[in-house]
Amino acid sequence: MLYQLLCPLHFLNEACHKFPNKIALGLDAKDGYLSVSGWKENSNQLTLDYLKEVNDYGISRLIYTDINRDGTKQSPNFEETAKVSEASNCPVIISGGVSSIDDIKKAKKLKNIEGIIVGKAIYDGDISLEELAKEIYA
């Protein structure tokens, strides 16, 4: 398995036990499969299967990026994100595709979502920091 060559499960498990609730795990996925090497290579590992393997390690949170949506402002892949957040034993941070404040509102309604990373929509002026702050603290 390609991903395990870069981060063997025993290493992740050991790190989580040595630093309980201090490890955030980034899951970068494309079409339901984990991607590695800066998104240059797709693995044959299904994201949800991998998550099931590591779920009880004591990971503090997941940062889930849908590569197909990152930087596109086409809205996050809420369907796949919901599957990940429901399967996860820890809170999930969404990354990839935020286009408007409506995406933030929708993300807040999902189970087990701790946050959402907003990049290009702020940079391009589609979401103002003031508008974002109002929604976060609403």
Where are these regions (language model features)?
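Active-site environment of divalent metal-dependent phosphoester hydrolases
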Residues: 70, 100-102, 124
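Catalytic cores of alpha/beta
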Residues: 7-13, 79-114
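C-terminal helical cap(s) of enzyme catalytic domains, especially alpha/beta-barrels
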Residues: 11-18, 104, 108-138
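RNA substrate-recognition surfaces in RNA-acting enzymes
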Residues: 73-74, 107
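Charged helix-capping and loop-helix junction motifs
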Residues: 40-49, 74-83, 133
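Conserved, mostly hydrophobic/aromatic
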Residues: 25, 62, 84, 107, ...
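Glycine-rich beta-to-alpha transition loops that act as phosphate-gripper elements at the mouths
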Residues: 5, 27-29, 75, 91-101, ...
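Conserved anion-binding
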Residues: 1-70
